[in-house]
Amino acid sequence: MTFIDMLGAAERQNHSMLCVGLDPEPARFPGRLAGDASKIYDFCAAIVDATADLVIAFKPQIAYFAAHRAEDQLERLMAHMRRVAPQVPVILDAKRGDIGSTAEQYAIEAFERYGADAVTLSPFMGFDSVAPYLKYHGKGSFLLCRTSNPGGDDLQNQRLASVDGQPLLYEHIARLAQGPWNLNGQLGLVVGATYPAEIERVRAVAPTLPLLIPGVGAQGGDAAATVRAGWRPGAPIIVNSSRAIIYASSGDDFADAARREALRTRDVLQAARADSLRVATP
């Protein structure tokens, strides 16, 4: 089953567009786990177990593991997710961006070492930096396009030439992903929830690609506006929330609290989709 197929199956089975981001910070761990980097796996596995039936995907951020020399715990977590939630695709948030043999090694890391179903990439170095990942049949790759951070304006919102009618850089990336770069049919785009107008523009340029949309929750993105801007029938969106869910409680009930917040967010997204369908139906 390809990554795109897995997304569709998880969306139907779990009635969800919600992705839970796994960004473990031991200093923020609740209760008995507080401050203990050796418990990264335990913390993340508890979140996974509590939310696996509510999500379209999980998204572990590799830096949060590597910073604590916890890559072995990430490997265990990937195996755990495959075991307890085989229907839910896992997006490795790595934002790699290199060329040639180095990119090939990063692709091996993502898809062979960790067994991810998809990976996030920076396309700044051009197609050479993306091509090694496309050799993996059925594996997904999300290109950074219009990210949720304020500094994204420095590059992504600039025109390719100082002439009216020329596309902005993020629009050009979307066109490449929708067209000539999508050799394995599994490309997607990262577009921040903090910019709903840009989400709508990306969706117009790339009408069929899956959109990974971070920024809902702690970053302040509006869930309903995100769905209205990006969701279309047959064009999936994966709306990520990390800190608002995984740190919903500072006590030992953190997994139960994460489930409650994930359920609330999922239902907000589903209600917004239902509203969009009603508006679109004559």
Swiss-Prot record:
Active-site residues per Swiss-Prot or TrEMBL entry:
95
Q: What is its EC number?
A: 4.1.1.23
- Which molecular-function annotation in GO is an example for this chain? orotidine-5'-phosphate decarboxylase activity
* InterPro entries, A to Z: Aldolase_TIM (IPR013785), OMPdecase_AS (IPR018089), OMPdecase_type-2 (IPR011995), OMPdeCOase_dom (IPR001754), RibuloseP-bd_barrel (IPR011060)
One Pfam family, please name it: OMPdecase
Protein keywords: Decarboxylase, Lyase, Pyrimidine biosynthesis
Report the catalytic activity. Answer: orotidine 5'-phosphate + H(+) = UMP + CO2
What highest taxon heads this organism's lineage? Bacteria
One Gene Ontology term of the biological-process aspect is: 'de novo' UMP biosynthetic process
Presence of the UniProt keyword Zinc in the record:
no
Q: In which pathway does it act?
A: Pyrimidine metabolism; UMP biosynthesis via de novo pathway; UMP from orotate: step 2/2
What protein family does this chain belong to?
Belongs to the OMP decarboxylase family. Type 2 subfamily.
- Its name, as the record gives it, is Orotidine 5'-phosphate decarboxylase
Biological classification of the source: Bacteria, Pseudomonadati, Pseudomonadota, Betaproteobacteria, Burkholderiales
Supply the gene name. pyrF
